[in-house]
Amino acid sequence: MKKILALVSEPVSGEALKSAIGKTEAEQAEVLVVAPALDKSYRFWLSDPDPAIDRAEEVQQETVERMEEEGIDAAGHIGESDPLLALQDALATYEADEIVLFTHPDSDRSFLEDGIVDQAAERFSQPVRHIVVDR
């Protein structure tokens, strides 16, 4: 069984994963959904991480529910605010075969701005796939 680590900043459907890696492969995979607790800069300065944690919890729960409804074995986890640290922490306990980074074209939480996709590909031994999905 293939193990996939999916990093999401917004809720993602099982269909998005199926279109990314193939329907059969997605339905036979075990997926760990990681939603980083992404802080807006002003929240960081106010030292109030709760809204970011609450949002990450919502994102991972909704993503896991969507994937399970579409026949994908998924579990969720809230990660560090730094997406690379969130991936690193998850990989310490979850032996993923592949990392899939989901971004949204209009999201203010885009990992692209910070070069997260390229950095993840350089840092981790697993193949990294980047998928842009509509909301």
Mark where each language-model region is:
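Small/aliphatic-rich secondary-structure junction motif
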Residues: 2-47, 130-133
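Structural motif
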Residues: 3, 98-100
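Glycine- and acidic-residue-enriched helix-capping/strand-helix junction motifs
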Residues: 48-57
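Structural beta-alpha unit
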Residues: 70-98
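Glycine-rich, Arg-bearing micro-motifs that act as flexible, cationic patches
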Residues: 102-119
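Glycine-rich, aromatic-bearing surface loops/beta-hairpins
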Residues: 122-131
